[in-house]
Amino acid sequence: MEQTLSIIKPDSVGKAHIGEIVAIFEKAGFRIAAMKMVHLSAKEAEGFYAVHKSRPFFQELVDFMISGPVVVMVLEGDNAVVRNREIMGATNPQEAAQGTIRAQFGESIGINAVHGSDSLENAAIEISYFFSKTEIVNSVE
């Protein structure tokens, strides 16, 4: 069993798509090991996306991520990182396969409904950014 981090971004939260997106993850066989809604500060968003600090889209990404609340989840399941990324779809919703979350709910490459960890190593880092071990139910050891 693996764990991965998923974030329902401000665009999807603001359009009341939380339940639909959570249902997609559950129907795909993921177990939600932790979940909370937070409104990120600029400092928190900058810290979370620090890997992108030198990229031209960094400030736009931070501004978007602090524009409203987000739902942060730890998803658990077999091959969780890869499966989550398949379910999310391509970063650009126009290139995302039909039936994926981004194809259904994303608007643009910057406003694309969800975030998901891109590797097991990053999943562990990202999960610990938002959750303590005691907040994760039946966590993978």
From Swiss-Prot:
Example GO BP: GTP biosynthetic process
Single GO term (MF): ATP binding
UniProt keyword annotation of ATP-binding present: yes
Residues where ATP binds: K9, F57, R85, T91, R102, N112
Annotated catalysed reactions: a 2'-deoxyribonucleoside 5'-diphosphate + ATP = a 2'-deoxyribonucleoside 5'-triphosphate + ADP; a ribonucleoside 5'-diphosphate + ATP = a ribonucleoside 5'-triphosphate + ADP
Keywords of this entry: ATP-binding, Cytoplasm, Kinase, Magnesium, Metal-binding, Nucleotide metabolism, Nucleotide-binding, Phosphoprotein, Transferase
Keyword flag Cytoplasm: yes
A GO cellular component entry from the record: cytoplasm
Transmembrane feature ranges: none
Subcellular location: Cytoplasm
UniProt-annotated catalytic positions: H115
Needed cofactors: Mg(2+)
PROSITE patterns xrefs: NDPK, NDPK_LIKE
Gene3D superfamilies from the UniProt entry: Nucleoside diphosphate kinase-like domain
Known EC number: 2.7.4.6
PANTHER family: NUCLEOSIDE DIPHOSPHATE KINASE
Family: Belongs to the NDK family.
Quaternary context: Homotetramer.
Function: Major role in the synthesis of nucleoside triphosphates other than ATP. The ATP gamma phosphate is transferred to the NDP beta phosphate via a ping-pong mechanism, using a phosphorylated active-site intermediate.
Name of this chain's protein: Nucleoside diphosphate kinase
Protein encoded by which gene: ndk
